[in-house]
Amino acid sequence: MSYVKYEEFLKKYGTPRTDAEGGEVALKKPDAIKALDLLKNTDIGILGGDVYELEGDGYFQPAYDNWYCDKNSDEQAIFAKKSRKMAIEYLLNYEEKPDADIWYVIVTDR
C-alpha cells in the first residue's frame, strides 16, 4: 500500500485527539491494526504509540500505556517491518478494561 492510503484511512476511521490541524489521530483497536496493515509494503516505520481512554465529555485521557521501537542501526526497510510487527503484537496483547472506551495513537517516522 502507500502512505496516502494510510492517511485516507486515518481520515475516514480515526478521531482527532485534539483540535490542532494535522494533530494526532486516535483509532479503535481493529482500525489501528488495519492501519498498520496498510503500511505493510512500505518502508514507513512505527516509532511507537500511545493508549487513551475516551471519556464521556470527549476528552482523551492518557492511559499511561505505550510502546516504542528503537531504530538502532537497522536499515529503514528492516526497521519498518520490525516496528510494525512490534506494534501489532502490542495491540493484540493489550487488555482493554471491559467498561473503558480505549483508543490508540500510532506514531510513524514519516
Regions found by a protein language model. Name each.
Residues 1-26:
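Long, contiguous N-terminal structural blocks used for assembly/anchoring
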Residues 6, 29-32, 84:
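Short amphipathic alpha-helical segments that mediate assembly, nucleic-acid/protein binding
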Residues 12, 16, 42, 93-97:
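Surface-exposed polar/charged interaction patches
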Residues 15-20, 29-33, 99-103, 109:
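Acidic, Ser/Pro/Thr-rich low-complexity regulatory regions
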Residues 18, 25-35, 41, 72-76:
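Structured alpha/beta or helical-core interaction and ligand-binding surfaces enriched in interleaved
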Residues 22, 28, 47-49:
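N-terminal targeting/docking segments
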Residues 44-85, 90:
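Acidic, low-complexity, intrinsically disordered interaction modules
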Residues 77-110:
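Amphipathic alpha-helical binding modules
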